[in-house]
Amino acid sequence: MHLSALLTLLPAVLAAPATIGRRAEPAPLFTPQAESIIADKYIVKFKDDIARIATDDTVSALTSKADFVYEHAFHGFAGSLTKEELKMLREHPGVDFIEKDAVMRISGITEQSGAPWGLGRISHRSKGSTTYRYDDSAGQGTCVYIIDTGIEASHPEFEGRATFLKSFISGQNTDGHGHGTHCAGTIGSKTYGVAKKAKLYGVKVLDNQGSGSYSGIISGMDYVAQDSKTRGCPNGAIASMSLGGGYSASVNQGAAALVNSGVFLAVAAGNDNRDAQNTSPASEPSACTVGASAENDSRSSFSNYGRVVDIFAPGSNVLSTWIVGRTNSISGTSMATPHIAGLAAYLSALQGKTTPAALCKKIQDTATKNVLTGVPSGTVNYLAYNGA
């Protein structure tokens, strides 16, 4: 991406009202705590107080050049920058910060065996039940976005309630992996779902190998913030993100912008058996961050922990839908997260639409307390419960 045209336009459309020209100090340049940085790719965040019409003018100039343009909840763009372009942008007063782009991956671990125990666990105070108890409102009137590898919408378990909505992976318009379909099944399939009447929308930000760029994931969140306002979701909009990577200011701000738009966001704590405070989007305070539990009421051995974790949910050996009309049992905080997204839809249908913060607190208040073993000090010992 070559931004010569943009850079001549920026002083006219992005300058703060009282200041045109270079800033006193360059805009921060962040490097995310990620395993794989994408060379010469950057995420540029505009200041929130820039007039929308000015931002829209910039978006028009970038449409054919940027990899992604953010124009809804998160304002900016992502793409390739030369050293000269990077320097010029950092000196512009309309730029909030710039961050190197990186790779994010799913938070699931594939396994071959398992049983559908999770629904029984979240509908009983004690472990061991194989019966799922729930109110028959079952998430009706809610829209749940699965920001993942996509959804196989034709799977019979979805009963026509699922839609593959949008792909941010070039040339891939199906779930060729299975992870997103599995998460969607835990949220709202007829057999394996927490909220069996919710509408399900797949937004593909991870490729068929389970990886995606930070910039593409921000695009997915920005898209959901806008799309959720156009759909008939009288009981609220929920998003589920079973993915994660090293700490990223831009990913966290993208998540915060999605929540600020009114969408409840459940995110995976991660599978590294470490404190989640240095991972994104798990460390974003406004998201509802989910750790994983096992069938024996222990913290799953892989689950991250720490003060950023809001709730635990079943995440080991979870049976759900898979691609090509099949089912599969897999483990990870990826599997715990859709339990919470489904529970958010379930409670929203049962009790009415509320704010994302109030809904996460409701999930915490309703949870079964202090039954999990292996939870480190400083981490909440809350296991999801639907109140049935």
Swiss-Prot record:
Domain Peptidase S8 residues, every copy: 116-388
S-S bridge residues: C143-C233, C288-C360
Molecular function via GO: serine-type endopeptidase activity
Positions glycosylated per UniProt: N296
Signal peptide feature range: 1-18
A Pfam family that the UniProt record links to this protein: Peptidase_S8
E.C. numbers: 3.4.21.-
Main location: secreted
Inhibitor I9 domain segment(s): 41-106
Catalytic site: D148 (charge relay system), H179 (charge relay system), S334 (charge relay system)
Keywords: Disulfide bond, Glycoprotein, Hydrolase, Protease, Secreted, Serine protease, Signal, Zymogen
Cellular compartments annotated: Secreted
Propeptide: 19-107
Alphabetical GO biological process terms: proteolysis
Cellular component per GO, a single term: extracellular region
Functional note: Capable of breaching the insect cuticle.
Similarity-based family: Belongs to the peptidase S8 family.
Protein name as it appears in the record: Cuticle-degrading protease
Species lineage: Eukaryota, Fungi, Dikarya, Ascomycota, Pezizomycotina
Primary gene name: PR1
